[in-house]
Curated annotation (Swiss-Prot):
Belongs to the UreE family. It comes from Rhodopseudomonas palustris (strain TIE-1). The keyword Cytoplasm applies. This is Urease accessory protein UreE. Residues 154-171, 207-218 have a biased composition (Basic residues). Involved in urease metallocenter assembly. Binds nickel. Probably functions as a nickel donor during metallocenter assembly. It holds the Pfam family UreE_N. InterPro entries: UreE, UreE_C_dom, UreE_N, UreE_N_sf. The lineage of its organism: Bacteria, Pseudomonadati, Pseudomonadota, Alphaproteobacteria, Hyphomicrobiales. GO terms for cellular component: cytoplasm. Coiled coil: none annotated.
Length: 218
């Protein structure tokens, strides 16, 4: 099986990709993992260390071909405040609980958590359930990744809109807020009682079919 041994950051590649992999936040942070693209290309992700991939990055195959990384939509909470000062206060409370948080100009996004949703409402915030790609802050000590290619830092991303994605079967080798055996598509049941619910993505998107990724070794 051909290997992908390097990563090119978004905006640092222009060639037409040989295939595309659609990955959720967990599966975008792997070192070694068997993957299959949306057009059927199978390969082994085999990096020197785990890299936090972002939508728009490219995996470099041994023969020089590229595989585009697309961030899959996930069940999230979008949080808004009355004004910028209120939103900063809400962000502080999320950070105080060490929750991975995506910072936006007028909103915050976190993984869906009914306990946190109730807390935010108690603080006067508005909470809406959405499905969108999740791109949280990496933290002050998260290194920019190069993995043999040019490094890139945290900046705005061109997300891709998807209605669903395939299963990524694997054992998790690192901690997550909610431990689970496998990531499931968004047709699976989520409890939405007591919440407003709609699906949207503020970023530009184009449709992809969805491939599968299988854990090989972490």
């Amino acid at each position: 099986m051909i290997r992908a041994t390097a990563v090119r950051g978004q905006h640092r590649w222009t060639a037409t990709p040989a295939d595309t992999v659609v990955l959720d936040f967990d599966d975008r942070h792997r070192r070694r993992m068997a993957m299959t693209g949306t057009r059927g290309l199978s390969f082994l992700l085999d990096l020197e260390q785990a890299v936090a991939l972002r939508g728009g990055d490219a995996l470099v195959l041994e023969d020089g071909r590229l595989v585009e990384v697309v961030a899959a939509p996930e069940p999230l909470l979008e949080i808004r405040g009355h004004d910028p000062q209120h939103l900063v206060r809400l962000a502080w409370h999320l950070g105080n609980r060490h929750l991975p948080t995506q910072l936006m100009a007028k909103a915050l996004r976190i993984r869906r958590d009914h306990v946190i949703a109730d807390m935010v409402r108690g603080l006067g915030g508005k909470v809406v359930e959405i499905e969108a790609p999740f791109d949280p802050e990496g933290g002050a000590y998260a290194p920019a990744h190069d993995s043999g290619e040019a490094a890139h830092g945290h900046h705005d991303h061109a997300h891709h809109d998807h209605g669903h994605h395939g299963h990524a079967h694997h054992d998790h080798g690192h901690d997550h807020d909610h431990a689970h055996d496998h990531a499931h598509g968004h047709g699976c049941g989520h409890d939405h009682h007591g919440h407003d619910h709609h699906v949207h993505d503020e970023s530009c998107g184009h449709q992809h079919s969805h491939g599968h990724s299988h854990k090989h070794e972490h």
